[in-house]
Amino acid sequence: MSAFIDPPKHVPFYLKFGLWITKRVTGQELLPARLLAWYPKAAISSGILEALVAHRDENLDERMLKLVRLQASLTAACPFCIDMNSVEDTHARVTPEELAALQGRTDVESVATFSVREKLAIEYTRLISRTPLSFPPAFIQKLVKHFTEREIVILATTAAQVNYWARLMQALGIPPAGFSDQCKLPPA
């Protein structure tokens, strides 16, 4: 499986450092980074977006943000994103039952291991990741009751960042990179 287009044969010198960082962080020469070299402004802005997204905050731990990333990947049905964001499920302590709920195979509310805040973050991510966007007032009331303004912005920007990558990966036909050893897409 390959992308719709090939990477450029020559990469501008100022993007080579970013490609080196990507390889150092992921252990791979990622196709998305190489394809973005066709339009250096997109490569630079995408790199900045990726570098500045929250991976933990004082009240939003790594697990909650991981759940948001994985849920956004699954809702957008992006194979590359699912592969990238599910590789460390065990580090984030995502159980098989929780994964089934994220995949939509079981109800999130029925999973006792999700905290109230995690359930709300998952639902918020689903709402952010669907088209058309719709945020029921009753849900927003619950959200603002359980999260600070800062936390809501971090949840929204994390989900939006994954959605950016999901649409970009799919628009360029980028296949999974092989980070995880199994497909996390729910069965058809």
Which ranges hold each PLM region?
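Acidic/histidine-rich alpha-helical segments that form the ligand environment
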Residues: 113-156
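Mobile cap/lid helix-loop segments that border enzyme active or cofactor-binding sites
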Residues: 1-60, 186-188
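N-terminal hydrophobic signal/anchor transmembrane helix of membrane proteins
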Residues: 66-86, 100, 105, 153-170
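Preference for long, well-ordered alpha-helical segments
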Residues: 142, 149-188
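Acidic/His metal-coordination segments adjacent to aromatic residues that form catalytic metal sites
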Residues: 102-116
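Amphipathic alpha-helical hairpins
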Residues: 59, 63-67
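Iron-sulfur (Fe-S) cluster-binding segments and ferredoxin-like electron-carrier domains
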Residues: 41-44, 82-101
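Short acidic alpha-helix initiation/capping motifs at coil-to-helix transition points
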Residues: 41-47, 77-81, 120, 129-137, ...
